A protein has these predicted regions:
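Nucleic-acid processing machinery
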Residues: 1-19, 27-28, 35-42, 46, ...
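Hydrophobic or amphipathic alpha-helical targeting/insertion segments
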Residues: 78-111, 182
Length: 357
């Protein structure tokens, strides 16, 4: 009985605020899955029936919903996330041609991902280029595969994830998320993959972050309060907050610079969000007037955006107590793009606007 309600619960959650045609599509998708899975016999003695397969499909769909994707992408994510379902022709007949067409692109992309892994970085770069060329017809297909991998890595406490899968994630999935500008997905894929590949290193960095959490939070809170006051005096409307650091990026920086954990300045980091570009540079002036900046650690990605259109000002300063501090400054629009990348506009296209989120 619990299984029967999985689709209904998921539908009630993700359909809120979507237009009627999108809700109808999601309902057709759930009905299709129920019909197919309820009619399938267990595949072997180790098969727990449809429960885990349903959970994976709807879990992938939930991740795509959290990315503000449209109903077609959610439907494809749910269907693609459940193995051993009938093919594209069945989906076309029961759910609709647009969903079937996108599912076909997902399967094509999956074929590129399943090619034998190259051992050299140049080979991996070539695979990524081929992957990007393949997905040009519909970028949403890439988001479906990223959501699948993210679901599997999140579930690693219940389902074993091999070091090979984690390595593939670091060489293909995480860079793909970066190219698409979906930074929080990239960071989570990297952190979870490191936990699989280097569990002791992951635990050690996590432990050190936890041990210093109180000290770090007190420091950041004081910095945030001081910066808010100075921005207010300068009549700059801005949101200032601490910025979380990610275990994989900390580990990579420790490796690249041969540093110990305590030597990493950007474990202490804050973010400033302004209303327009002019105020970004004005806020930068305030930061540099408060604390001495480190010229080699300054990057202007507003004037010179990254290839995935990421824009922000990055600076590092000698903050209070002579501790180094990283500061990122960007507009709220730039921040939305940095968080969701190419996924940012799909719900607007579907209808319902941001209220649908």
């Amino acid at each position: 009985a619990v299984v029967a309600h999985d689709g209904a619960d998921w539908l009630a959650d993700v359909a809120v605020g979507r237009p009627a045609h999108a809700q109808a599509l999601l309902e057709r998708c759930c009905n299709y899955i129920d019909t197919v899975l309820d009619g399938q016999a267990p595949r072997n003695e180790a098969d727990f029936g449809a429960t885990a397969r349903r959970a994976r499909g709807y879990g992938v769909g939930r991740i795509l919903h959290d990315l503000d994707m449209d109903a077609q992408t959610l439907a494809v994510g749910v269907i693609a996330g459940i193995d051993d379902l009938p093919g594209v022709s069945s989906v076309k007949a029961e759910v609709g041609e647009p969903v079937a067409a996108l599912l076909a692109v997902v399967e094509k992309l999956r074929g590129v991902l399943d090619l034998p892994t190259s051992v050299d970085e140049g080979g991996q770069a070539e695979r990524l280029r081929r992957l990007l060329v393949t997905m040009v017809s519909d970028v949403r297909a890439a988001l479906v595969l990223l959501a699948e991998r993210l679901y599997d890595l999140r579930a690693q406490s219940r389902v074993s994830v091999s070091p090979e899968i984690a390595a593939q994630t670091l060489s293909l999935h995480a860079p793909l998320a970066s190219r698409l500008g979906i930074w929080h997905v990239k960071w989570e894929l990297e952190d979870l993959s490191l936990r699989v590949r280097e569990p002791e290193i992951y635990k050690d960095i996590a432990r050190q972050l936890a041990q210093r959490r109180v000290d770090r939070e007190c420091y950041i809170n004081a910095v945030v309060e001081r910066l808010r006051e100075e921005l207010g005096r300068a009549e700059i409307v801005a949101e200032v907050s601490g910025r979380p650091k990610h275990i994989y990026s900390i580990w990579r920086k420790m490796q690249a610079k041969s540093l110990g954990f305590h030597e990493l300045f950007d474990v202490r980091a804050v973010r400033v969000l302004t209303e327009n570009v002019a105020e970004c540079y004005a806020a930068l002036g305030v930061v540099h007037s408060l604390w001495s900046h480190m010229p080699r650690e300054f990057d202007d990605y507003i004037a010179n955006p990254k290839s995935n259109r990421y824009q922000s000002l990055h600076t590092a300063v000698i903050g209070p107590e002579s501790r180094t501090l990283e500061v990122q400054i960007r507009t709220t629009v730039m921040h939305a793009h940095a968080e969701r990348g190419v996924a940012a506009h799909w719900r607007y296209k579907e209808g319902g606007g941001p209220a649908a989120a």
